[in-house]
Each structure stands twice: as structure tokens, then as C-alpha cells.
Amino acid sequence: MTFPSNAHTHSRWCDGANAIPAMVEAARALGFVSLGFSGHAWQGFDPDYSMAPDVQAGYFAELRALQAAPEPGFPRLWAGLELDALAHPDCRRAACAEADYLIGSAHYLCESYGGTSVAVDGDPVLLRRYVDEVYHGDGLAMACDYFAIEVNALLRDRPQIIGHFDLLRKYAASLSLFDEADPAYRRLALSALERAFPCGGVLEINTGGMARGYLTTPYPTLELLCAWRELGG
């Protein structure tokens, strides 16, 4: 017996394509028992990628209204947030206070480089330039910093869900940042996973990179998923 559900869902309130009611109806038609929305929480520096405070307030208002008037046969709704590792302290406090649950994710390497934030899943041209100029082209050094940012945030925030753990793989091949099969990278990723384990969150299997044609395997890799299982996750 299965219990169809999803906890990592984006709507038009942030970078999703559809309105919340339409997504709830689609989930009902698919037989979902629950549906969690996880809009990108305001992180304090990038309004193009996250919900500004007033938008975040509207997001919660819509979800709370739907939660207050559940319809028979529709999935149970959860009002969550995806909190970035570099979110400012006041943004983290607000997210913890407002959300039913948190997805802890690392998107950014820095919040401002020449006036623009640099995300591992953002502008590939900017990411390549950042790696060349800051890391002298060393993608493994970038990966080391990325995982440090991610692990530190997971242990600090202790989210209920760990989002796309190895998101930095998105452009690894197309930008020649590093080779996923390189033992040095694999050791780096595995070490980060082991350090993150005490945060207590559920490690999600995220197929976003596959759905958009960037990858042929999910986040995280099968190797990391098996390692997580062996750790007790």
C-alpha cells in the first residue's frame, strides 16, 4: 500500500509554474494523501529567487485559508518553507516561526559577488566565472566550500527535510567543474553526508535535475543514498 505525497513543492508565489489551488486539485486527482508546499523563504539578499516578506505573507495567508477549510477527498495541506543555508538570522527566525516544516537547502556560494549572488543552480556563466576567478578554476575547491556551507547550516537549523543534497552537480559536467566519478569528489561528498547526518532531517530524493534535462540521476547520487541508509537514515 502506498501513500502518495510530496513535500518539496513550489508554486507561483516563488519560482513554480502553477497556482496553489490548481496544484492541490492535481494532487487530489493523483490520489495524494498530503501535499506540502515549500516556497523559497526570504533569505535577505536575493528577491529574484525567494519570496520577499510581503509575498511570503501572502503565501502563508493563502495556505492557511485552505488549511482552515479542508474539502473532503482533498489531500491534507502543509505550509512549509525551503530555507537557504545563507539566509540571514532574522529570516531564519521568521521561517522557523511561520512554517509547518522546513526544507534545508544550499543554493548559494556567496550572497554578493560584484553585486550579484552566485548560486550553484543559477546563472551558469556567472558560476563558471566565479569558480575561475575565486577558485582559479578548481571545481573541487568550490565543492569543498559548498558542502561546508550546507553542512554547517543543516547542523545549525536542523530542518525536517534535507533538500537536494548535492545540487552542485547540476552544472558539473556541462561547465567541466568536476568529475562526479573522481574519487576525490566522491570522498568529499560522502564526508559531507556523514557530517550532516546528526542534523536528524529526512534526506529527500529530488528528481528536479532530471525533469529539467540537466541530469540523468536524482539528487543525491545512489552512492550517497546507500551511504545514508547504512548510517541509519
Where do the PLM segments sit?
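Extended substrate/RNA-proximal surfaces in nucleic-acid metabolism proteins
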Residues: 56-198
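An N-terminally biased module of ancient metal coordination in phosphate/nucleic-acid-related enzymes
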Residues: 1-85, 94-96, 100, 169-184, ...
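Short, well-ordered secondary-structure micro-motifs
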Residues: 47, 90, 215-216
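Short acidic/histidine-rich active-site segments
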Residues: 40, 165, 231-233
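Active-site-adjacent C-terminal substructures of enzyme catalytic domains
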Residues: 183-233
